[in-house]
């Protein structure tokens, strides 16, 4: 094993990558970058029955989206490839047959029916289910349908020092003679990961806590094959708010779903880093560079992390507010294009969107909220009840006069900018013996169709003189057509 830090992210394409899986990738990436080492991606595609088409592409898309660049792996190559296990089958067979030849593994001819019956009987007798080792000492050879099992030592213990959990010990007698090579010639995870971690000179294995019980099997394989094992660190689980294992019932679990929902990659990297690691007890916002500088296994928790959706939304809002108008506009465009009102408006372009984004940047927590916050700044097809133009303490006639006066004042402005508009409209309210909020409310409804909208005069400036005055004229017409009402 090399002295260089070499870690790997080794997903199985049996589904789309969930957050826990990507959190593991990120901790490996941070560990490699912190130590000036290498981050390797290896696709463990040996479970052909559960293989999901498109899963590999989704895995790589997730890594690319989060900026977790790899030094070796798919699309990159490297000195230790290939990086798909399905392309490395001869290596696993050679290792398995070596173990058989040395008496450390054996061919098992038991049928699946026999194994099922064995487990049923064990459960009926209230015994822990497992293989009864009936083929262990029979010296059987290869035949169709046979598997190769590893010979577990029947006594003693297997111990190792986990870099997060400390000393961990397992009784060998409680381990099963596990399969290392299946009847179809594909290896199990146990054999393939050990062979590949050795061949790729992996120095540290950072993986999910669920793999902790498998570690004695892997250490036994390392010893039997004459390999030096890597150092192990088992990362804490991620739980939902109810402290059960994070699942779809808690909300989205696929990384790509978070991308589609409008979370920023910067947010996800920051948020996921805090699921099991902390720099101190108060700092929550970290740049990528800070995470690389601060990350260490000594500060990874042994206890499960709780996924807090409210905190994620808060953090995403914080990151959205740090973006420049240009950057936010570029990121917003794909989401705005999906809104039919905006898409049909004729105003959706990057230059205009750069002007719109600062109006709503403070209110958005996710990119997929942007369209609802600003569609009326794009679309001129705004409809509303004209009664909303009338303040609850005013009459139709008073409101109509106020709107006409405001329209005339706005038409006369040499510069149609927010500062000029406020400079002339605020005094107008006093002249009309209205509160500023009453006049501003009428103009807000007239120019946006909304009662709650972005800052009024800045919005009117972005709309521009022609569109804004056209909307106010339409409001005056609608209000004029309304029957008079009681004061």
UniProtKB/Swiss-Prot annotation:
Keyword Aminoacyl-tRNA synthetase: yes
Protein localization: Cytoplasm
Recorded catalytic activity of this chain's protein: tRNA(Glu) + L-glutamate + ATP = L-glutamyl-tRNA(Glu) + AMP + diphosphate
Annotated keywords: Aminoacyl-tRNA synthetase, ATP-binding, Cytoplasm, Ligase, Metal-binding, Nucleotide-binding, Protein biosynthesis, Zinc
Short sequence motif named 'KMSKS' region, residue ranges: 245-249
Protein residues bound to ATP: 248
Note on cofactor: Binds 1 zinc ion per subunit.
Coiled-coil features, chain-numbered ranges: none
EC number, UniProt record: 6.1.1.17
Gene3D superfamilies: 1.10.10.350, HUPs
PROSITE patterns the record matches: AA_TRNA_LIGASE_I (PS00178)
Recorded GO CC terms: cytosol
Residues that coordinate or bind Zn(2+): 108, 110, 135, 137
Name of a matching Pfam family: tRNA-synt_1c
Motif ('HIGH' region): 11-21
Any one of the GO BP annotations: glutamyl-tRNA aminoacylation
Co-factor requirement: Zn(2+)
Protein family according to the UniProt entry: Belongs to the class-I aminoacyl-tRNA synthetase family. Glutamate--tRNA ligase type 1 subfamily.
Purpose: Catalyzes the attachment of glutamate to tRNA(Glu) in a two-step reaction: glutamate is first activated by ATP to form Glu-AMP and then transferred to the acceptor end of tRNA(Glu).
PANTHER family assigned to the protein according to its UniProt record, in alphabetical order: GLUTAMATE--TRNA LIGASE, GLUTAMATE--TRNA LIGASE, MITOCHONDRIAL-RELATED
Subunit structure: Monomer.
Protein name as it appears in the record: Glutamate--tRNA ligase
Protein's organism: Dehalococcoides mccartyi (strain ATCC BAA-2100 / JCM 16839 / KCTC 5957 / BAV1)
Lineage: Bacteria, Bacillati, Chloroflexota, Dehalococcoidia, Dehalococcoidales
Gene field: gltX
């Amino acid at each position: 094993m090399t002295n260089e830090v070499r870690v790997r992210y080794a997903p199985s394409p049996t589904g789309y990558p969930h957050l826990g899986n990507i959190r593991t990738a990120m901790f490996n990436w941070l560990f490699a970058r912190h130590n000036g080492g290498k981050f390797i991606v290896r696709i463990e595609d040996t479970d052909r029955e559960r293989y999901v088409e498109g899963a590999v592409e989704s895995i790589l898309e997730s890594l690319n989206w989060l900026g977790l660049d790899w030094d070796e792996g798919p699309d990159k190559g490297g000195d230790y490839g290939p990086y798909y296990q399905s392309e490395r089958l001869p290596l696993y067979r050679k290792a398995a047959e070596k173990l058989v030849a040395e008496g450390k593994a054996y061919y098992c001819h038991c049928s699946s029916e026999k194994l099922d019956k064995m487990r049923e009987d064990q459960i009926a007798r209230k015994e822990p289910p497992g293989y009864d080792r009936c083929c262990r000492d029979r010296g059987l050879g290869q035949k169709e349908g046979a598997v190769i099992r590893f010979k577990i030592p029947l006594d003693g213990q297997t111990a190792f020092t986990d870099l997060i959990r400390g000393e961990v010990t397992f009784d060998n007698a409680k381990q099963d003679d596990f399969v290392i090579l299946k009847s179809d010639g594909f290896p199990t995870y146990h054999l393939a990961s050990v062979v590949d971690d050795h061949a790729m000179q992996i120095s540290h294995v950072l993986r999910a806590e669920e793999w902790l019980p498998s570690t004695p099997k892997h250490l036994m394989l390392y010893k039997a094959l004459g390999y030096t094992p890597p150092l192990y660190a088992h990362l804490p689980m991620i739980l939902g708010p109810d402290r059960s294992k994070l699942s779809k019932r808690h909300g989205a679990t696929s990384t790509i779903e978070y991308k589609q929902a409008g979370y920023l990659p910067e947010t996800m990297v920051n948020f996921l880093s805090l699921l099991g690691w902390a720099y101190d007890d108060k700092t929550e916002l970290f740049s990528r560079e800070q995470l690389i500088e601060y990350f260490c296994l000594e500060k990874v928790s042994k206890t499960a992390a709780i996924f807090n959706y409210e905190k994620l939304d808060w953090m995403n809002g914080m990151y959205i507010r740090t973006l420049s108008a240009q950057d936010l506009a570029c990121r917003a465009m794909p989401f705005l294009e999906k809104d039919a009102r905006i898409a049909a408006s004729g105003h959706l372009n990057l230059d205009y969107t750069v002007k719109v984004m600062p109006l709503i940047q403070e209110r958005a927590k996710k990119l997929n909220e942007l369209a609802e916050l600003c569609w009326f700044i794009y679309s001129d097809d705004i409809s509303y009840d004209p009664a909303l133009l009338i303040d609850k303490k005013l009459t139709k006639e008073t409101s109509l006069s106020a709107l006409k006066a405001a329209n005339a004042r706005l038409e006369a402005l040499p510069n149609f900018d927010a500062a000029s508009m406020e400079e002339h409209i605020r005094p107008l309210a006093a002249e009309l013996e209205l509160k500023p909020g009453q006049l501003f409310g009428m103009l807000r409804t007239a120019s946006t169709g909304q009662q709650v909208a972005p800052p009024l005069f800045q919005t009117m400036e972005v709309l521009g003189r022609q569109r804004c005055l056209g909307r106010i004229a339409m409001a005056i017409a609608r209000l004029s057509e309304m029957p008079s009402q009681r004061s």
